Amino acid sequence: MGYVMKLLVAFLTLAFAFEGYLMPNTAAPNPPEEGYLLVANKGTEAMGIIDPSAGRQIAEVAEGGTTGHEIAASPDGRTAYVPIYGNSGVGKPGTDGRNMAVIDLASRKVVGNVDFGKGVRPHCAVFGPKDGMLYVTTELDKAVAVIDPKTLKIVGSVPTGQPESHMLAISPDGKRGYTANVGPGTISVLDMENRKALGVIPVSKEIQRIALSTDGKLIFTSDQTKPQLAVIDSSSREIKNWIPLPGLGYGTAATPDGRWLVVAVRTANKVAVVDLHRMQVAHVIDVPAAPQEVLVRPDGQMAYVSCDASKKVAAIRTSDWGVDKLVDAGPGADGLAWAGR
């Protein structure tokens, strides 16, 4: 009887396992992360607030200056920070912005201001992942300003040693910073803890934008002289790969699982999805004119791409890389930020 019972138990175990193999997984997908998508509408000198679930821009907040290109949202999702850059593009003649607007998202009003004391063309604002400080590129100072968001005081700076330090990425541990220096075509490597420059990585004659892999081991920037993406090893500071693109790349963002890099291909009105395991483009998606910046939602389910010339933001599903919806934004839609709720 004991032997028969053992056979019966073994049979039932296999039967249940086989049934589980055949039965589809009926578990409900994770609900989408709640929050607002913030967009810098350069043409109206205002920050747009998009409700992603409704698929529309529900408000605009005047920034009070000419003009914000990028946005940072506070970790608690209550406040937005918009550096006021000026009326020109990077390296071009024009006005030199000297302040950053602070916007309360609940009241949708400007509630604070950071004055840099002179025209510095403040551009990209990034929260430190560990220290809670707000870091802002100040191009004309060849530096990154360190701001305490609680007091709105400038408490330090990190020199980049290069002109046109336009965009900033910070490693997940908060120890290293990397700036994309457009005109020189270089990347500055920064010691964020000791607030000093560690070196410069030459990439091309001109580059745009910068992003890191989720583990901080790879740096990505788009060559502006050839349709290719530079992949740089952050430890050796050497170019590891050049990935061909269907046009000149621009903004990039990695998915939270570390598998994909989403690349705006500005000159081709497309988005390229790079497989980071194979280091090659796996998907190409048509989007409206002049895709600029890419933001992957924290839950990884959606990628948002601002499209400057078309007043649109494309929402792209990461499950099948299809365009979920096109959201009407403002003219010159550029910088993006996610304000979680």
Language model features: what each stretch is:
Residues 1-8:
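Positively charged n-region of N-terminal signal peptides that target proteins for export
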Residues 12-341:
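Predominantly soluble domains enriched in secretory-pathway, periplasmic, or organellar proteins
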